[in-house]
Amino acid sequence: VSHIQAYLYQNGIVYPRYIIEDFFALIQTNDLIILAGESGSGKTNLIKSFAKAVGGESIIIPVKPNWTSAEDLLGYYNPLEKKYLSTPFLDALFEAKRNPDIPYFICLDEMNLARVEYYFADFLSLLEERDKDNPPEIKLYSEDESSHVSSELKMVLSLIESTKKNLDKNHIEDYVGILEDKEVNQELRRVFGFSDKNSLIKYHSDLKRMLSGILNTPASITFPKNVRIIGAINIDETTHYLSPKILDRAHIMKFDSPLLNNWVAIGDEVKINENSHLKLKFKIEDFGERTPYPSFDMEDDFCKQMVDLTQVYFSPLGVEVGLRTIRQGLHYKKLFSIFNADDNLAFNNFLVHKILPKMTFDGSIKIEIKERGLLTKKDILNEFLEKILEIFKNYRNNNGIDAVRELKSIIKNSTSNEDIVNYWA
């Protein structure tokens, strides 16, 4: 991390260490990462810069507002042309497949200009498969289509060979020779049932296009191990909120304006040496493997803490926290510890990534809670703030997005918005 920070610094790109630590740990999870922040806060620049520093490739795919299905992301098979119409995203996956030793960071820029669940939900479900020896397989079109093209090609070759044999023209070795030989040309037109408007040249061209289509775009592709998917979102009146399904599976990494950074402190962090100008060479495994999340264990302090918080606060608030979320938290904490041993910072980051983004509800709704009486959701949220302050009572976060500060901001904003709680507002 120190080398990456110094390399970027020497190239005029300034990021505090905590951002690089957090991003690297999230990259290693193999989960979907969504960078959230104002336009110009450095979201896509982080992806490009990080990729450059680690000897990788970054590909930025702009999302369009009219994306409504997986076809907009992955393309579709055109049965009339017998050809697969690809997309920049799919092309990027194939490029990564051809270069398995290079890490690829594919960014869906302005991801929420369209509803993410419309075009990305199926793909996101595939990413849930976490067997490193059996990577997810992305089905692009039916195997029957490629079989049909292969069968047609075999039939054509068979008819050509039999026609040459019947006319004693076995000396003809290529398609040009067939076209130049009037007798063979005419017989093939008859065998194929061509009308006067059809030509062997056009038919040959169509066959080449169909064959090229199935060779260039096979019916399926296994998700490349060297690819990480990252989304970048802005929140304004032109964008859509992320659905619960997306929030449950993704990690949200929030960005403040770079103008709020402590530039002097960042300069003090950077450790320049004679090798700082060199890119690092990583193995693909250094970016994490798609292995199962750690098991849920009630003897683990983090698991016990999350169960307690869920029962007392999250469930009454309607904030969905299941085993997946807790296991993702265990996974992130383990990976983050490689770069930073601060457990409090890891828990702070987890709250910012996985819990606070789910906080959207009407705070004025009243709930009867056993042994606590009738409370509004806003009351429960304030109690949660007190609990977090207690957890962090001996800890001061000077690194990045502070969960306590964020929670206070959520509560303050709701007060001026008729108690409507919305993390994204």
Over which residues does each language-model region extend?
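AAA+ P-loop NTPase catalytic core and its hallmark functional loops
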Residues: V1-I284
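Alpha-helical lid/collar subdomain of P-loop NTPases
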Residues: A265-A425
